């Protein structure tokens, strides 16, 4: 329904008639006439969507593995945690004017398809030796003109404390990050410059949040269960093992190439995950119209 609504107003309100799917797993619509902007926001709201924090020096959208929820190598589904973090960060009164934009990525798989090490904060869902679920936390990654791999600041953090810990991470960045030079304002520059001093300050702030503030952002099991219920897999028809399509011999090579590049294992051994490309001849990768 959300995609259909975007396709409809993308056709009626955009002079170019198409949107753009980006590598950060969202959709951009450019060249919206200012006179139509309010109407577009109203249409988005009808399908529970918005454009809040899609730009500016704030916490942007939370990204994750494109195969989240179906990946065969998944330790835990990262989508409920991504949604919980999205709700925490949206309209956060303390983090609406950071030194620079701030991007968080999370993965629950052994293969890092979300490239979390190249984000301001990268989160790996892992299990410790006792089998308890938690996060490995990296901070200060990024690409651009100064590519940096994130620094590990917590080898294991209990899953229910992730918001309290990120509160400390972003708070110290908000306090210490440079605002005098846009090219030196990302958290990767701060972490590289301060090193252990930044890590120690985050840990001290985190302990203050736990002891003095009463750990206000601790995730309860009930809350995790509530959000997880929004990601229940759809009911699918039983897979028939008797139906199989044949491929003409002259197209077998193309099919084998597609099978290798576009098809991945699924956690349900009877299914496969298929990637559909937006790249077409004669147009920019990611551009898509209503058709």
Placement of each model-derived feature along the sequence:
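Peripheral terminal and linker regions in Fe-S/redox and tRNA-modifying enzymes
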Residues: 1-291
């Amino acid at each position: 329904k959300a995609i259909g609504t975007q396709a409809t107003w993308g056709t009626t309100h955009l002079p170019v008639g198409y949107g753009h799917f980006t590598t950060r797993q969202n959709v951009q619509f450019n060249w919206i006439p200012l006179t139509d902007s309010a109407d577009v926001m109203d249409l988005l709201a009808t399908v529970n969507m918005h454009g809040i924090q899609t730009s500016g020096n704030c916490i942007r959208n939370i990204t994750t593995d494109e195969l989240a929820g179906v990946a065969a190598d998944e330790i835990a589904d990262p989508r409920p945690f991504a949604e919980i973090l999205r709700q925490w960060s949206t309209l956060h009164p303390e983090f609406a004017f950071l030194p620079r934009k701030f991007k968080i990525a999370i993965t629950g798989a052994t293969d890092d398809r979300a490239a979390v090490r190249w984000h301001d904060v990268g989160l790996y869902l892992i299990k410790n030796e006792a089998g308890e679920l938690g996060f490995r936390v990296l901070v200060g990654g990024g690409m651009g003109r100064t590519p940096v791999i994130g620094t590990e600041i917590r080898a294991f953090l209990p899953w229910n404390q992730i918001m309290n810990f990120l509160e400390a991470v972003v708070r110290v960045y908000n306090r210490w990050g440079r605002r005098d030079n846009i090219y030196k304002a990302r958290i990767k520059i701060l972490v590289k410059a301060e090193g252990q001093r930044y890590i120690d300050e985050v840990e001290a702030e985190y302990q203050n949040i736990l002891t003095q503030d009463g750990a206000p952002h601790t995730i309860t099991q009930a809350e995790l269960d509530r959000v997880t219920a929004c990601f229940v897999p759809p009911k699918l028809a039983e897979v028939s093992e008797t139906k199989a399509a044949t491929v003409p011999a002259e197209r077998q090579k193309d099919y084998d190439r597609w099978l290798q590049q576009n098809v991945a294992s699924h956690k349900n051994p009877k299914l496969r995950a298929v990637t559909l490309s937006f790249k077409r001849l004669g147009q920019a990768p990611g551009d898509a119209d209503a058709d």
